[in-house]
Amino acid sequence: MRIVSLTAAFIFSGSLMVCAQDVKPLSSPAQVDSLIGSYSGKVLIVNLWATWCDPCVEEFPDLVKLYQNYKDKNLALVFVSLDQPGDLNTKVLPFLKSNGVDFVTYINKFKKQEDLINAIDKDWDGAIPATYIYDSRGKMIGTLIGGKTYAEFEKVIREDIPN
């Protein structure tokens, strides 16, 4: 009986580990550059969003679906939440879990919002959702501001994703 209980506990704890969400702070321009550079060789989508932003919430499942459909073809997806860090456990983590996000995500911890804006794109006015797409060499190839659809995201990445 102990073996059954231990086995069940092990399996249950393992499933919790798979569902656990890793959210890291994003707090400096150097960290943004390093993050983008770390995906060299992959097409990278960086999406800035928040749980309080209706268009962000609406497009989120399309981005997750796009990632699931193309991750084996060198597509990477990075979410950066603009929620308050104090909302991490009550809003951000439950939202990520409900959308099946099982990869590292970031939360804005820049001291000033303007510093994050300048680190991402000096021409960005701070409106969200904001999605930046980089080719495999780290060159920005697309900027999508406002809520978008799966088809709109796919159109931008299609040229740079191998068949």
Regions found by a protein language model. Give the residues of each.
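Short pre-active-site segment immediately N-terminal to redox-active cysteine/selenocysteine motifs
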Residues: 42-44, 48-52, 127
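Short, internal strand/loop/helix patches
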Residues: 95-128
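Thiol-/selenol-based redox modules, centered on thioredoxin-like
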Residues: 127-163
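Solvent-exposed loop/turn segments at secondary-structure junctions
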Residues: 50-54, 82-87, 110-113, 148-150
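Bacterial Sec-dependent N-terminal signal peptides
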Residues: 1-24
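Conserved redox-active cysteine motifs that mediate thiol-disulfide chemistry
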Residues: 48-65
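A short beta-strand-turn-helix
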Residues: 23-43, 67-70
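Thiol-based oxidoreductase modules, predominantly thioredoxin-like and allied folds used
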Residues: 74-89, 101-111
